[in-house]
Every structure is written in structure tokens, then in C-alpha cells.
Amino acid sequence: MRNIFKRNQEPIVAPATTTATMPIGPVDNSTESGGAGESQEDMFAKLKEKLFNEINKIPLPPWALIAIAVVAGLLLLTCCFCICKKCCCKKKKNKKEKGKGMKNAMNMKDMKGGQDDDDAETGLTEGEGEGEEEKEPENLGKLQFSLDYDFQANQLTVGVLQAAELPALDMGGTSDPYVKVFLLPDKKKKYETKVHRKTLNPAFNETFTFKVPYQELGGKTLVMAIYDFDRFSKHDIIGEVKVPMNTVDLGQPIEEWRDLQGGEKEEPEKLGDICTSLRYVPTAGKLTVCILEAKNLKKMDVGGLSDPYVKIHLMQNGKRLKKKKTTVKKKTLNPYFNESFSFEIPFEQIQKVQVVVTVLDYDKLGKNEAIGKIFVGSNATGTELRHWSDMLANPRRPIAQWHSLKPEEEVDALLGKNK
């Protein structure tokens, strides 16, 4: 028993582990770290050597390469500086405008007794626009006129008295004004005053009458438009006065001044078209003009039709040498004539003459009114000149072509200019 007790008192020894014991003290890693450092230095040296090799291959001296690098650096710095400056200025401007707008908004709110946010926004908008100059309305002059309505005769009398302070549209610092008077919307009757030469303060003193029932007068607008007459081109509008008749008390005569307003350019009135044929035989010295037909002529009669016929004048240097005319076609705006007329013109004179074609409305009782006019010749323009040139380029062959009719005064002015 004693032996057993002694055996149990023997100390218990732990079994040995298989793991190796770590040495006590600092670990020497100098070998590994030294190897890594050497490899990085080698790589850097190789890259440096490669870079210098590439630079040496460039066919430029070292100072040139340095200069290029300096210039590139300066450009880069300049670009960065400009971008920064622009951004700073923009922020500063936005901040300033915002502060100014808020200040104006607050002022507007104080003046109006504390309005809502919409009023503050309006103040901001007005504050931003303070620097902009307001465009002054153009001064076109003024017109004095009179109105008088005869209730028994259902007749409106319009007096065009005078104009003042008109703008100068001619080269000499003046204008040649006249007035067109008509009622909208129909424009059935259009009057014109006489042209007053070289003046900016014309005295017209002319009256015009319109037969209009009083019940219909309220739906009409009186227009008095002042134009500058030009003999050789389209007349320019100076300004106009519009008077809605439903705004006027016609119980007594009216006389007043009104400022001229900018008027819309008047579209050229469509007068219709005419088809003519030209044929010239140089050896015989014979010019044949055939009036074939016309279409879409202007309505001249009360019934909405016309009684058209055509006059042909052979002219030279502004003088009428010969005259011919067609028969009258009754009550039509699209007459068919097919009538030919011959003129004896030597070849050496053919470039010196003009053929003037006028379409007129026949009136049994009164004067025959011209609907429109054209002329062909070597001094014509547009389709008229082309027609004449085609005729001369194709002797003995009839050449037909359509022409748009023009106002009589416009063609007469061109003929006078070409004398």
C-alpha cells in the first residue's frame, strides 16, 4: 500500500509537443528585405536608362527639349488659370445678380405693402433688366383728318387735311408723300390723294366719300396710309392711321390729329396674266405679235366681271409708232383672243423698239380703264426680256409665253426711264 501511495505522488509530466520552439530574441530578416530593395532599384534604373535612351533617339538638342517642356508647362498653367478665373467670375456674377435681385424684390415688397412671392419674382426680373435701355418708339409723323357722316344719304365723308413731321425717305432728305384711303375689310373702293413733291409737311386738303349704310359702318375700319412716291420702284409706306368705326361718335363732325403707326407692306395687287406669241423674220423685217389669251383678270365691273380687250403699241424712244387692238370680250375674266398683228421693222431697228401690251376694261358709258400692262424689248427685264431674246434667237419661229400684268404707272415709269 505504501508503494502504491508513493507511486501516485510522482509528478505528472506533460507529453512533448511536435511544434518546434521559437528562438527567443530578434529575428534576422536582413536577407529577404535586402533582396526586395535591390530588385526595385534595378527596375527603376532600367526604366531610367530606357527613358534616357528614348530621349537620346530624338533628333533635337537637349536645350530644345527643355524649352519644349517649359512651353508645354506654361500653356498648361495658363489654361488652368483661365478656367479657374472664369469659374470664379461666374460665381461672383451669379452671387451679385442674386443679391441685387433679392434687394429689388425686397424693395418691391416694401413699396407694395408686402406682396406675395410672385411679386418678389417680378421685382427680381425688373432688377435684372434695369441696365437695358428702353427702345424709343420710332417717330413716323402725324396726320390730321376729318370725318362726317350723312345719315340721310348713308354717306361717310373722309377729309385728308395735312401731315407733319414725316420721316425723310429720299436721298435729298425729303419725301414725296401721298395718302391712300380705304375701308377694311372689303377694300372695294380705294382713293389716293395727289403726290406732294419734296416735303415732310404736306397739306392735302382732299375729301373722299364712301357709300355705307350706318348699320354696316360699325364693322368697318378706316385706313389712311401715307406712302412715299418713287417713280422707278415700289412705293414705300411711311405709316398709317387706322380708325375702327365702332369707336367713333359720328353724331357730329370730327377733326383730329393722330400719330402714324408702322404699316404693313401692301401686297402687290394681282391683275392677271396674258399669253402672247412673238415671231420675227429678219429677211422680211416683219414682227408678228399674237395675243392668245388672258386669265385671272382683275374684276372691274359691279357684277364681278370685266369686258377686256387688248391694245398693242409699237414704240421707239418713248414715241408711239403704230397702234393695234383686239376685239372686246364681254363679261369674262379669262378671255380667249387668238388675234395676230404685224409690224414692219427693219433688222437694224429691231433692238431699238418696244412692244407695249395693255389689257383694258371696256366701258360703254365712261372711260376705258387699264387693268394691267407689260412691254417686251431689248431694254425690258425679267420674263419680258427673256421672251424677246428667245424670239431673236429663233428667227421665223413663233415663241409663246405667259406674262404677269403690272400696274400701268409702273410700266410707264420704266418706259420713261428707258427713253
Swiss-Prot record:
Side of membrane Cytoplasmic, spans: 84-419
UniProt biased composition (Acidic residues): 116-136
Chief location of this protein within or outside the cell: membrane
Annotated coiled-coil segments of the chain: none
Stretches assigned to the Vesicular side: 1-62
Glycosylation sites: N29
Annotated stretches, region: Disordered: 16-39, 99-138
Protein localization: Cytoplasmic vesicle, Secretory vesicle, Synaptic vesicle membrane; Cytoplasmic vesicle, Secretory vesicle, Chromaffin granule membrane; Cytoplasm
Necessary cofactors: Ca(2+)
Binding site residues for Ca(2+) 1: D170, D176, D228, F229, D230
Modified residues (Phosphothreonine): T122, T125, T199, T383
GO biological process: calcium-dependent activation of synaptic vesicle fusion; cell differentiation; positive regulation of dendrite extension; regulation of calcium ion-dependent exocytosis; regulation of synaptic vesicle exocytosis; vesicle-mediated transport
Domain C2: 139-258, 270-403
Example of a GO cellular component annotation carried by this entry: dense core granule
Entry binding sites for Ca(2+) 2: L169, D170, D228, D230, D236
Entry binding sites for Ca(2+) 4: D301, D307, D361, D363
Superkingdom: Eukaryota
Record's keyword terms, sorted: Calcium, Congenital myasthenic syndrome, Cytoplasm, Cytoplasmic vesicle, Differentiation, Disease variant, Glycoprotein, Membrane, Metal-binding, Phosphoprotein, Repeat, Synapse, Transmembrane, Transmembrane helix
Keyword Hydrolase assigned: no
Role: Exhibits calcium-dependent phospholipid and inositol polyphosphate binding properties. May have a regulatory role in the membrane interactions during trafficking of synaptic vesicles at the active zone of the synapse. Plays a role in dendrite formation by melanocytes.
Subunit structure: Homotetramer. Heterodimer; heterodimerizes with SYT1 in presence of calcium. Interacts with STON2. Interacts with SCAMP5. Interacts with PRRT2.
Domain notes: The first C2 domain mediates Ca(2+)-dependent phospholipid binding.
Disease affiliated with this protein: Myasthenic syndrome, congenital, 7A, presynaptic, and distal motor neuropathy, autosomal dominant: A form of congenital myasthenic syndrome, a group of disorders characterized by failure of neuromuscular transmission, including pre-synaptic, synaptic, and post-synaptic disorders that are not of autoimmune origin. Clinical features are easy fatigability and muscle weakness. CMS7A is an autosomal dominant, presynaptic disorder resembling Lambert-Eaton myasthenic syndrome. Myasthenic syndrome, congenital, 7B, presynaptic, autosomal recessive: An autosomal recessive form of congenital myasthenic syndrome, a group of disorders characterized by failure of neuromuscular transmission, including pre-synaptic, synaptic, and post-synaptic disorders that are not of autoimmune origin. Clinical features are easy fatigability and muscle weakness. CMS7B is characterized by defects at the pre-synaptic neuromuscular junction and severe generalized muscle weakness apparent from birth. Decreased fetal movements may be apparent in utero.
The name this protein goes by in its record: Synaptotagmin-2
Organism: Homo sapiens (Human)
Gene: SYT2
